[in-house]
Amino acid sequence: MTIEEEVLKRIKPSKEDEEKLRERAQIILDRLKGYNAEIEGSFRKGTWLKGDTDIDIFVFFPKSVGKEYLREKALKELIERFRDLNYKIAYAEHPYLIVYVDDVEIDVVPALSIESGEEAITAADRTPFHTKYVISHLDEKGRDEVRLLKRFLKGIGVYGAEIKVKGFSGYVTELLIIYYGSFKEVLRNASKFRPPVRIELVRPKKEFDSPLIVPDPVDPKRNASSAVSLKSLATFALASKIYLEKPSMEFFFPSKPGRQTIKGDILLVKVKIEESTVEDIIWGQVWRNVEKLKTLISHEGYRVIDISAWGDAENITIGIQLESKSIGEYYLNVGPYFYLHNVKNFIEENENVWIGEDGRLYSIKRRRYTVEEIIKRNLSFKQKFTYELQWLTEEVDDPWINLFLRKTPSWLK
């Protein structure tokens, strides 16, 4: 049995798995009698993975009611159908419901009924056209190839178009298989990717500026892969190259890292978001904080080895790895050459000024802030939040911290 056959055996749902989800979905559909409601997403397309226990049901309203109706009245109407069930309100471009039936999570999403993908007013409006396109272009073998590619992307950490991941959506994964024909062919081509990569199932109707460009076949004005970052594309390309040379289950099911040696000084910024907010909104702010802190800490003279973040919409950890947290209290401040117009300002603003052998002015300056002070002054979220700082002083069992310390993905070596 090949690795791909073994993986497929583990990830392909059985008839019993499918029937279980279909029965739960029918409970919701029965509650939506009178509405134009349909199952969408990977379950409908037959590309879902064993263990996935969520289903998308879209409820389509006339286009004439507009986006504001979806945000306000549509949600209230839908809630009336599920008051006696366990549900919660979630948020994307507009609110939707997550209804729990036993252990199955069912997203009930209001959308507008349109004639073509190009008429979409909200992102959800295109979904049925995505579903129809994929179903019409994939047979049973093609659906299995999608499953393999999904599991591969999950294993190397680049599956998901959300801001937290900045990776490949399920739809883009399906389009890659439709374009190249098989899992192995996708990897063979991905191993040669050089950005910008263009994969055109349809001629685009506008120019795109992204590492990966996949015009949406149902709306060619849209780049379906706009979420994919350069890092995610690079990870996919390198993982594809290495897998083709030396296949391993580690690409699909990576082993958890053991305890790692602490190299340098590690500061953990543990953030607690006190308000319920859309995960994409939180993670947009997380990555902006990461970039800002890296810049400010480096500017203060600390050498940053690495900085990253992990967590969810409520609990986030920002890991900062420094060569050393102990650096001099004073530092050399390099000024302008003696003949430049801002020499006078430099002299007035600094003490201990001298002229160097190179004709530049120099001074000695006291460092203004420690790393902790930089974080205290600059960490920010629009939502109410609290945080605590922890210097890592001993090895721990936390898999995310150990992954941050190890750096190297298990499939890379």
From Swiss-Prot:
Gene3D superfamilies found in the cross-reference section: Beta Polymerase, domain 2, CCA tRNA nucleotidyltransferase, domain 2, Poly(A) polymerase predicted RNA binding domain
An individual GO BP term: tRNA 3'-terminal CCA addition
Domain of life: Archaea
One MF annotation (Gene Ontology) recorded for this entry: magnesium ion binding
E.C. no: 2.7.7.72
Keywords linked to the UniProt accession: ATP-binding, Magnesium, Metal-binding, Nucleotide-binding, Nucleotidyltransferase, RNA repair, RNA-binding, Transferase, tRNA processing
Protein name: CCA-adding enzyme
Binding site for ATP: S42, K45, H130, K150, Y159
Binding locations of CTP: S42, K45, H130, K150, Y159
Top enzyme category: transferase
Xref: SUPFAM superfamilies: Nucleotidyltransferase, PAP/Archaeal CCA-adding enzyme, C-terminal domain, PAP/OAS1 substrate-binding domain
Phylogenetic classification of the source organism: Archaea, Thermoproteota, Thermoprotei, Sulfolobales, Sulfolobaceae
UniProt xrefs under InterPro entries: CAA_C, CCA-adding_arc, CCA_tRNA_nucleotrans_2, NT_2-5OAS_ClassI-CCAase, NT_sf, NuclTrfase_I-like_C, Polymerase_NTP_transf_dom, tRNA_NucTransf2
Other known facts: A single active site specifically recognizes both ATP and CTP and is responsible for their addition.
Self-association and partners: Homodimer.
Gene label: cca
Alphabetized Pfam families for the sequence: CAA_C, NTP_transf_2, tRNA_NucTransf2
